[in-house]
């Protein structure tokens, strides 16, 4: 698999800008970042560990 060329990245960013608009772009980026963060947490099992700690403290 090869990396996209710089002009391809610019084209993709322009298409995203046209679709979402400049005002919505920060919200889209924030949502994407949160989604990736939650996905990584789910893969590492961090949520399960937090739940176990809360149960232990509540007992």
Curated annotation (Swiss-Prot):
GO molecular function per UniProt: protein transmembrane transporter activity
Main location group: membrane
GO annotation, biological process: protein transport by the Tat complex
Domain of life of the source: Bacteria
Keyword annotations from UniProtKB, A to Z: Cell inner membrane, Cell membrane, Membrane, Protein transport, Translocation, Transmembrane, Transmembrane helix, Transport
A single Gene Ontology CC term: TAT protein transport complex
InterPro entries: TatA/B/E, TatA/E
Compartments it resides in: Cell inner membrane
Residue intervals passing through the bilayer: 3-23
Topology with respect to the bilayer: Single-pass membrane protein
NCBIfam families noted in UniProt: tatAE (TIGR01411)
PANTHER family linked: SEC-INDEPENDENT PROTEIN TRANSLOCASE PROTEIN TATA
The protein's assembly and partners: Forms a complex with TatC.
Cited function: Part of the twin-arginine translocation (Tat) system that transports large folded proteins containing a characteristic twin-arginine motif in their signal peptide across membranes. TatA could form the protein-conducting channel of the Tat system.
Family stated for the protein in its record: Belongs to the TatA/E family.
Identification of the protein by name: Sec-independent protein translocase protein TatA 1
């Amino acid at each position: 698999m090869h990396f996209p060329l710089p002009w391809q990245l610019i084209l993709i960013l322009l298409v995203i800008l046209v679709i979402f608009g400049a005002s919505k772009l920060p919200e889209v980026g924030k949502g994407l970042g949160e989604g990736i963060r939650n996905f990584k947490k789910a893969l590492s099992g961090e949520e399960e560990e937090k739940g176990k700690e809360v149960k232990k403290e509540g007992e």
